Design a protein with these regions (language model features):
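Charged, alpha-helix-forming regions
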Residues: 1-256
Length: 256
C-alpha cells in the first residue's frame, strides 16, 4: 500500500486522496523528541549554509579587489587576446544525458550549467572559458576542461598564447557584466564577445591571482572539501535519522 509505505509522498491535486493519506502518530512526548532531534540537524545545516553564503561573498569581494588594477595591467579586448568559437548543432552521434559510455566520452555543452550529452568526437582540444550567448542565461560564464564540443551558439573563448592564463581569463570574465544588446530574445554574437575588455597583468601576477582565487573557489563550491562537503554530509545524516526515527514511530523498531 503506497499510502502506508515509508517515504511515500503525500498525494497532490486529489483532495480525497489527501484526506485518506495515512502517517504514523506516536505519543506526544515521542513526537517532541523526534522534532527536537531533527530540528537540531536542520539548524546545523542552516548555520553551515549561512556560513557558506558569507564565504561566497568574501570570495567575490577579494576577487573584485584582486582584479582591480590601477596601473599594473594593460586593458585589452577579448578579440586581441583570444580565439572565439561559436557552437553549432549537436554532433550527429551525440547521446543526450549526463552519463558517458565507453565510446562517447567527450562532453557536449550547451548554454546551461548541465552537460547536454556526450560524443565520440570533440571540437575544442584545450581548456576554455565558455559564455552563454542566447536565452535567459546569456552572459553566464563557465570554465570547461579540454576536449568538448560547444553547441547552441555557446561561445568558447581560448587564449591565443601563453601570455594569458585561461583560469585568469575565467576569473576576469566572471567579474565583467556581460549583457546582450538585443531588445527581444537575449543573445550575443562573436563580435560582441570580442569587444569585451579585461585587465591583463604579467603572467606571474596572473598565476598568483589564480592560485588565491582557485583555492577560495574550491572552499566555496567543491563538494569534496570545506563547507559544501560538510553541508552535504549533514543533509545525508538528517535524512538517515529522519527515516530511522519515523520508522520507529510507525513500527516500534528501527532499521538497524
Amino acid at each position: 500500500d503506497v499510502q502506508n509505505s515509508r517515504g511515500a509522498k503525500m498525494p497532490r491535486g486529489d483532495k480525497e486522496a489527501v484526506m485518506k493519506y495515512k502517517f504514523p502518530v506516536p505519543p506526544l512526548d515521542v513526537q517532541r523528541e523526534i522534532v527536537h532531534i531533527l530540528d537540531s540537524f536542520t539548524l546545523l545545516t542552516a548555520e553551515l549554509t549561512a556560513e557558506l553564503t558569507a564565504r561566497k561573498k568574501q570570495y567575490e569581494f577579494y576577487r573584485n579587489r584582486l582584479l582591480h588594477f590601477e596601473s599594473d595591467a594593460q586593458i585589452k579586448t577579448i578579440g586581441d587576446l583570444c580565439t572565439v568559437v561559436t557552437g553549432g548543432e549537436p554532433p550527429t552521434d551525440c547521446i543526450k544525458g549526463e552519463i558517458s559510455d565507453s565510446t562517447h566520452q567527450y562532453p557536449v555543452w550547451g548554454n546551461g550549467k548541465e552537460v547536454y550529452g556526450y560524443s565520440e568526437t570533440y571540437k575544442i582540444d584545450r581548456d576554455a572559458v565558455v559564455i552563454s550567448s542566447i536565452g535567459a542565461n546569456t552572459g553566464a560564464v563557465y570554465y570547461r576542461e579540454a576536449f568538448f564540443t560547444p553547441i547552441i551558439r555557446l561561445k568558447a573563448v581560448m587564449p591565443k598564447d601563453d601570455k594569458l592564463n585561461t583560469r585568469f581569463l575565467f576569473h576576469a570574465l566572471s567579474t565583467t557584466e556581460i549583457k546582450s544588446k538585443s531588445s527581444s530574445v537575449p543573445n550575443m554574437n562573436a563580435n560582441e564577445i570580442k569587444a569585451i575588455k579585461i585587465p591583463v597583468p604579467s603572467i606571474a601576477i596572473q598565476n598568483k591571482i589564480v592560485s588565491i582565487l582557485d583555492n577560495f573557489d574550491a572552499i566555496c563550491t567543491d563538494l569534496n572539501i570545506g563547507l559544501p562537503a560538510e553541508i552535504e554530509a549533514r543533509q545525508k545524516q538528517y535524512e538517515y535519522y529522519r527515516d530511522l526515527l519515523l520508522t520507529f514511530a510507525e513500527t516500534g523498531s528501527t532499521l538497524l
